[in-house]
C-alpha cells in the first residue's frame, strides 16, 4: 500500500527505541557475542575453502585504488599478488591488483563484501544487500583457494595511480580509450 512520509518517520523512531530497549535487555548476550565475534571469525576463515579474493584492473587503476582504499579504511589487510595470475576469466597483475586474504579478523566483512548473492529468502531487502562490492565497482575479481594463493608485498597505503600522455603533444587530436574512472577528465 501507500507509505506516507510521517508513517516512515514514526516507524524509524519506534524501531530506534525498540532497538535501544532490546540492547539493554540483552546486554549480557551482546557483550558475550562481541567477545567471541573476532575469534570465531578466524576459526570460520580457517575452515573456508576460499583463502583469498583477488581484484583489480589494469584498464581502470583508479577504481581499483578506490576500492582498495575503502577496504583499508575497514582495517582489511591487502597484498599485491606474489605473481600475475588468471582466474575467473580475468588476468590479475602484480602491479594492478590486490589480494585480500580471508584469514584475518575482518573475515566476516570480507565474506559479505565479496560473496555473490543472487537469491534471497525474503522479498523485502534494501538494494545494497545485493551488491557484490567488486561488481559494484565494475572490477573483475576471483576467489582463490590455498593452491592459487600467492601473496606478494603487503600494501599499507594504496597509491593513487598517475596518468600520462604518451607520444607527446599533438597538433590535431588525441586518441584514447575511455576505460578508467577519471578518463572523462581528459575530454
Residue ranges and their predicted role:
Residues 1-187:
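Intrinsic-disorder/low-complexity accessory segments
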Amino acid at each position: 500500500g501507500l507509505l506516507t512520509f510521517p508513517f516512515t518517520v514514526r516507524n524509524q523512531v519506534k524501531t530506534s527505541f525498540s532497538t535501544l530497549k532490546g540492547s539493554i535487555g540483552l546486554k549480557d548476550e551482546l557483550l558475550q557475542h562481541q567477545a567471541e565475534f573476532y575469534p570465531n571469525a578466524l576459526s570460520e576463515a580457517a575452515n573456508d575453502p576460499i583463502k583469498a579474493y583477488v581484484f583489480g584492473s589494469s584498464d581502470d587503476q583508479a577504481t581499483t585504488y578506490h576500492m582498495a582504499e575503502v577496504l583499508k579504511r575497514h582495517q582489511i589487510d591487502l597484498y599485491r599478488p606474489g605473481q600475475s595470475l588468471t582466474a575467473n576469466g580475468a588476468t590479475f597483475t602484480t602491479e594492478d591488483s590486490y589480494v585480500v586474504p580471508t584469514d584475518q579478523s575482518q573475515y566476516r566483512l570480507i565474506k559479505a563484501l565479496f560473496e555473490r548473492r543472487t537469491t534471497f529468502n525474503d522479498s523485502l531487502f534494501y538494494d545494497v544487500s545485493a551488491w557484490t562490492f567488486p561488481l559494484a565497482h565494475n572490477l573483475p575479481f576471483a576467489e582463490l583457494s590455498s593452491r592459487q594463493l600467492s601473496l606478494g608485498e603487503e600494501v599499507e597505503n594504496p597509491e593513487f595511480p598517475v596518468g600520462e600522455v604518451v607520444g607527446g603533444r599533438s597538433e590535431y587530436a588525441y586518441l584514447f580509450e575511455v576505460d578508467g574512472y577519471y578518463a572523462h577528465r581528459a575530454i
